[in-house]
């Protein structure tokens, strides 16, 4: 884990707790079978938007690190995160609970 560009003097949790690794990320998906040319166009426009200085600065001010990539990159991230957190959940024997009243 690397230090935040916004607060470079603030140590990461991993500097105090060896092996600590948690991050959050956001992504945009499209329905299955969306034509490749549509996905590629959306990806190019989203990457261009994230690279725009004004938006990039705003996201950075919010403590976010805008990352651009391809649909393949994002798919790999989803698989890696699912596998990693699946192992954690199984090792800790975490079971789902009904958290929201009325949700079944």
Where would I find each of the regions flagged by the language model?
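Conserved, function-defining micro-sites of small-solute handling proteins
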Residues: 1-104
